[in-house]
């Protein structure tokens, strides 16, 4: 079991520990539970979906990376597939606070990167800020996404964000988590570049059409790819680097262990991820950063 879970693990009920131990002790635990694992854990622990999501929050919170605020937030995104996905907030020294990732953004993006195509609920240990409410408003779940908070009855996103502005106001019909493939190609055969290209092809950028993807290679040779997630309100858009860092951190990778990185984007796109990607990666200690355009 990863060391970051030890403190939270000790506080779990014995029945839940018994149910989760084989899952969390796996060498490459991906910070998610499959639908089958969720079913098994519920049968052993006696918890239902809502109670299990709340019980998992301390483990998700243990994934937080907060060198600035030291305020850890965890989230569990529940997919229509039945899978549960961990999320936690992430902060980075030496770059603007705008590069911060909120726990809800992390859980949603984690689910998206794992292939989830629709969310039914998100459970979080603190009320979602306005930024996160707007970010989630881009989802194909729409205002019916259920939000669960400790000590409160479940509410919908529509109740947390009344009279919202979203994709439909801009006549956008392809929503975040809808399956897409933009069909871009590159001649380069480098696996890291191809991973970034694949991410760009599945990115969500209906407002600028500036599709982009980032792939990170760590010192142990693992590759983590992230896609751009654009938002109708523009500012809550999540850059592809942040998506890649989400996948790396949530699975237990050290974000300071990135050996090289590739950004793939359009050569004449109206917005570019290059400057912020380079600056953030440099702050994390990675200088081998490459930009490839289609």
Swiss-Prot record:
Its cofactor is Zn(2+). Binds 1 zinc ion. GO terms for cellular component: cytosol. Substrate binds at residues 89-91. The active site is at residue 104. PROSITE patterns: CYT_DCMP_DEAMINASES_1 (PS00903), CYT_DCMP_DEAMINASES_2 (PS51747). Keywords: Hydrolase, Metal-binding, Zinc. It comes from the Bacteria. One of its GO terms (biological process) is cytidine deamination. Its EC number is 3.5.4.5. It catalyses: cytidine + H2O + H(+) = uridine + NH4(+); 2'-deoxycytidine + H2O + H(+) = 2'-deoxyuridine + NH4(+). InterPro entries: APOBEC/CMP_deaminase_Zn-bd (IPR016192), CMP_dCMP_dom (IPR002125), Cyd/dCyd_deaminase_Zn-bd (IPR013171), Cyt/Deoxycyt_deaminase (IPR050202), Cyt_deam_dimer (IPR006263), Cytidine_deaminase-like (IPR016193), Cytidine_deaminase_bacteria (IPR020797). Zn(2+) binds at residues 102, 129, 132. Residues 48-168, 187-294 form the CMP/dCMP-type deaminase domain. Pfam families: dCMP_cyt_deam_1 (PF00383), dCMP_cyt_deam_2 (PF08211). GO terms for molecular function: cytidine deaminase activity; identical protein binding; zinc ion binding. Homodimer. Belongs to the cytidine and deoxycytidylate deaminase family. This enzyme scavenges exogenous and endogenous cytidine and 2'-deoxycytidine for UMP synthesis. This is Cytidine deaminase. The lineage of its organism: Bacteria, Pseudomonadati, Pseudomonadota, Gammaproteobacteria, Enterobacterales. The gene is cdd.
